[in-house]
Amino acid sequence: MQLSFIESCFHAFKDQSALVHNLTNDVAHNTVANVLLACRASPAMVHDIQEAPDFVCLSDALAINIGTLTQTRLNSMLATAKMAHSKGIPWVLDPVAVGATAFRQQACRQLLSLQPDVIRGNASEILALAGMSSQSRGIDSGDSVAAAHAAAEALTQYAKVVVVTGEIDWVTDGMNRWAINHGHPMMTQVTAIGCALTALIAGFVGANKKAMAQAAVTALCYYGQAAEHAMQIAQGPGSFYIHFLDSLYALQATDVSQQARVTLYE
């Protein structure tokens, strides 16, 4: 199988030093910023509706995460996503705990109407977003990634690419599907690691607008491999976080491509 796109997508991302506009949750700001900086991207957190729609026009990509959702934040998210879509700026939706409350479900329905380029969630979130039965407990997924494959396909009517993250990540654009076997369980023991992945995917698709699915696959390989490298040294979640950032900083395109464990299903 040809994985030559990994190096080209990686280089495009690094060369662009993408400015990623993040409308993310309160818990995630620091980690999202640190991850993007370690990857040579530029983070921005501009939330207020008075300036966020204007600021996104200066950005290469937008990441929206509904983790700590309020009506005020939702209004800003909707206005900013609408602007991004109108300007052709790729944006990624992270529907955190969408199945937990009616407010989140309604918010995501509104956001889906603005046509995100990528949706990124765990299996339970993807199932709930597609209107299928899920077994989530808050932000934690109680479903397997395989159980969400059909839901991911259904959501391609709203987004160009759907990413389901879990033990084995899954990416679909409605025509091709990729399974990515990277990462480490320690990633679940540090808050906002998933939120930061959403931001990284946004940066990758912003730099690879004509190959968004491949860009998402590359981001997942890069991120998961960084976690694996970090756990060769780390002793627990604290040291993992430090070594994870260092690994993101150090990994090169050839490393990510040569170590990639990806299966393509056409």
Curated annotation (Swiss-Prot):
The record ties this protein, via CDD domains, to: THZ_kinase
* Residue numbers binding ATP: R120, T165
Listed cofactors: Mg(2+)
Enumerate the UniProt keywords alphabetically. ATP-binding, Kinase, Magnesium, Metal-binding, Nucleotide-binding, Thiamine biosynthesis, Transferase
Q: In which pathway does it act?
A: Cofactor biosynthesis; thiamine diphosphate biosynthesis; 4-methyl-5-(2-phosphoethyl)-thiazole from 5-(2-hydroxyethyl)-4-methylthiazole: step 1/1
Enzyme class, spelled out: transferase
**InterPro entries, per this entry?**
Hyethyz_kinase, Ribokinase-like
Q: Which domain of life is it from?
A: Bacteria
Family label: Belongs to the Thz kinase family.
**Stored HAMAP family:** Thz_kinase (MF_00228)
Protein's job: Catalyzes the phosphorylation of the hydroxyl group of 4-methyl-5-beta-hydroxyethylthiazole (THZ).
Q: What is this protein called?
A: Hydroxyethylthiazole kinase
Q: What is the lineage of its organism?
A: Bacteria, Pseudomonadati, Pseudomonadota, Gammaproteobacteria, Moraxellales
This protein's encoding gene:
thiM
